[in-house]
Amino acid sequence: DVIPDGPTTPEIAYQMVKDETFAQTQPRLNLATFVTTWMDDYATKLMNEAININYIDETEYPRIAVMNAKCINIMANLWNSPEQAQWKAGALAIGSSEACMLGGVAAWLRWRERRLAQGKPVDKPNFVISAGFQVVWEKFAQLWQIEMRQVPLTQEHITLDPQDALKMCDENTICIVPIQGVTWTGLNDDVEALDKALDAYNAKTGYDIPIHVDAASGGFILPF
């Protein structure tokens, strides 16, 4: 666990990594994975040729920034975004975990801004999610010190039950997180039913609790 005194040849370094990872699960046999396990040769070629490009540097790589914006537009149009702007609002993420982090932070900041404007405390935020969450939500709760309230999954309710979720909400709830492709079962939480129930709840309580949909694996399927 220390930096070696001398260099290692590329061949040996390669073999060391191959040997270290040999016994672990092969990606194509991992039914729990959320990533692509096979790509066309041209996709692999493009990735290899772009491996040294720091795409976040839009000044030096402006065409990649345009391509990113086009991808956001495609997603916005797919989901019938009402935005009229040429370039729709959105953000790119390396994977679903980063997307969850960004969505959670956005919900927390909106809640915090609203509470501060009302002169109310902001020290006890929480969010509501089913017990079938992916692990990034636990990390989000730990990193940002936000209470995670878990709605149990039962034989009667094998996806997020809207009424059970609402029972866990209060004025400090930054959002409710339905999941599309629950890790345990692959099933989808009913976003439409939750949205209707939450609209009624917000109207009754005066709260403004939003929904953040964790698209997970279901986000690749539901639009089609």
PLM ranges: what are they?
Residues 55-63, 88-95, 125, 182, ...:
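Conserved aromatic-histidine-acidic binding/catalytic patches
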